[in-house]
Amino acid sequence: MKEIKADSYSIWIGETSLSKLDITNYSMVAILVDENTKRECLSLLPKINNSIIIEVPSGEEKKNISTCNTIWEKLSINNFDRNSVLINLGGGVIGDMGGFCAASYKRGIDFIQIPTTLLAMVDASIGGKIGINFNGLKNQIGLFSNPKSVIINPIFLKTLSRNQLQSGFAEVIKHSLITNKKHWEILSNTSFKDLDWQHIIDISIQIKNTIVKADPLEKNNRKKLNFGHTYGHAIESYYLEEKKPILHGESVLMGIILECELSLLSQNEKTEIKNYLIKNFQLPDIPSKNKLMKFLINDKKNKEAKINFTLLNGIGNCTIDNLFTEDEL
């Protein structure tokens, strides 16, 4: 088992990491799950006496204020006080929404992240960003609040489909493209079935944690992590509006393809990245820019009435705050 020190909490990684689930000093414990993690993952946790289970429906379209009301109501009717803790057992939706509910319930109770998807392990559970979607726009309501701890156990990867693994792998690819050319070369030249997942999780978390610790509130270099996410969030919001939700990682991969075209890459580098993604991932159709524009102009990262991108200036390097008007895209 490995410990990575984040800003104010520890990230535990390994097959024995669940032994670090410490709830001894809390008055009450709730475990937030969806129908999938209740079925596949809940039994893998150590037994917690006198805990309650809060089950919510799965899916990005359920990451909204209505589901939060359900969570808050369960906490309230069970008389949870400020010395209680919420354990978020699930993917990015559970972690984002559960963290938001905990941080706002009675002005804040502790929460522990136990991510069960690759995407949540390498990205969503790290860094203290929590929130929900609003008015059809991705992550419009939220705040920064760190968990008490993050517990990452590769055993949960066995519960995932190949599509879910590939969705999480999108964030791994992003981390390599923005910071580490050597890591990108290893990933892009290794067969998916031959990947060492624990090693990949370890490296990816270290990349994100280093960036976040230096800029926890995303005032400067943390914006590097937004590569692929301006177009990516617009694509994800578009498919949600069409009632054809896609995985977050799928939208990020399509965002990477589009944002590479805006980046200061050589043509060979653009072709290398695009060909790798198209060859190795079965992606939905990329919507036209006209269909994405209303989502782009409402992106929370925008500045000066312009659309804000993080872009590559080479594989392993990126620049932040690249501003474009609608006409320039």
Where are these regions (language model features)?
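ATP/NTP phosphate-donor binding region
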Residues: M1-V85
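A glycine/threonine-rich phosphate-anchoring loop and its flanking beta-alpha core
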Residues: S8, W12, F100, S104-F192
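Residue-level signal for inorganic ion chemistry
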Residues: G14, I31, P115, N153, ...
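Glycine-rich beta-strand-to-loop/alpha-helix junction loops that act as flexible
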Residues: S58-G59, L89-G91, F227-G228
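Non-catalytic interfacial helical region
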Residues: T70-L89, G98-Q113
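Short glycine/serine/threonine-rich phosphate/pyrophosphate-binding segments
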Residues: V93-F100, H233-A234
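C-terminal charged capping/lid subdomain of soluble metabolic enzymes
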Residues: A170-V172, E269-L329
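Active-site segments that bind and position negatively charged phosphate/pyrophosphate groups
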Residues: I186-N290
